Amino acid sequence: MDTAFPVCGIVAEYNPFHSGHRFHIERTREMLGEHTIIVCAMSGNFVQRGAPAIIDKYARTKMALEGGADLVLELPVPFATAAAPIFAEAGVSLLTRLGCVDALCFGS
């Protein structure tokens, strides 16, 4: 699917969303263009290894949107609570199956 602007996917937990996450989104736009659409695949109320998130998914979504994301999608619980390889694979799969994501950007 062609879009007028590039679409970049980010797989994250944002537990909680902080200035480093904001920097990651800003830097992604610097690299891909200021009109890049940022779509995040984020864990819900439970994160990797089944731990409860320290802030609920709605508040974390709001923080991500206020921090520069354009769309936040919830990674289903069985994948969000899995080990890192499964978490990552599911996040990438969710984003690529949207059919509009042009790039993925990861931080560390």
Task: Kindly give the residue locations of the regions a language model identified.
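Nucleotidyltransferase catalytic core that binds NTPs
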Residues: M1-S108
